Amino acid sequence: MWAKAKVQINTPITSTNNKVNFQFAHALSRLGYTIKLHEQYPSATFKLNKITLAGSPDGTTNAFYKKGTIDLSTVKDPTSGATTGLWNTSSSDKQNFDWFSGTYENLSTTASNPDKANNYLFVIPQEFKEKTTENPDVDELYVIVNYTITYSDNKTQTNTVYKQIKKNFERGKAYMLNLTIGLPIEFDVNLTEGVGVEDWGEDDGINIGSNDNNPWDGIE
């Protein structure tokens, strides 16, 4: 949280009438996720093993800034309107997040969270793009999902699917990654985004998979 206020006090400093009104705002971005099946499969069961947020499809490149500094002098001035931003993330020290690691078998066509509905990840605001020859020095983000399918003949198949997320995660906004998994040709991720208000607002959603013409980038 952060707040900034400028006020001129005309009464003695010891007076109880001296009050400064602060309006607090969220300094971070909030990320959440849900997962569901593309459809019910009578001849197969699904088990979620792991969800990772990383800077590359194989998880070897880090994505998120570990630290940064907040400079309140760069916050938009209500009078002049001048601003240059809030966060300084000049450090190249980054990290990935294992959002879920374990066993989750309660998968259905209804979106759910293996942990709990309000289990969120709070990150330093950061813009993720796709690297190109012209712009090689950008931050990339991938969501990687590992799950196991058990068929009716007891044969198993473990899949790892990934999708690049190209999004500017802004401070004070909430985002929801809605993941859909299924048989090897059926995957979906949706990201929903919330407005930047003090109570986080509605989530900005990212949908990935077959239902939204936005399929997973790859499967292993």
Where are the language model's segments positioned?
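Generic beta-strand hydrophobic packing signal
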Residues: L31-Y33, N49-S56, V75, N190-V195, ...
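Short amphipathic alpha-helical segments with coiled-coil-like heptad repeat character
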Residues: Y41-T45, T180-L183
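Tryptophan-paired
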Residues: Q8-I9, P42-K173, S210-E220
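Intrinsically disordered, low-complexity repeat and linker tracts
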Residues: F169, K173-E220
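A short, Gly/Thr-enriched small/hydrophobic beta-strand-prone motif that recurs across taxa
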Residues: Q23-E39
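Hydrophobic side chains in beta-strands
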Residues: W2-A3, I35, L53, Y147, ...
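Intrinsic-disorder/low-complexity, polar/charged segments enriched in Ser/Thr/Lys/Arg/Asp/Glu/Gln
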Residues: K19, R30-G32, A174-M176
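Short N-terminal edge-element motif at the start of the domain
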Residues: M1-Q23, H38
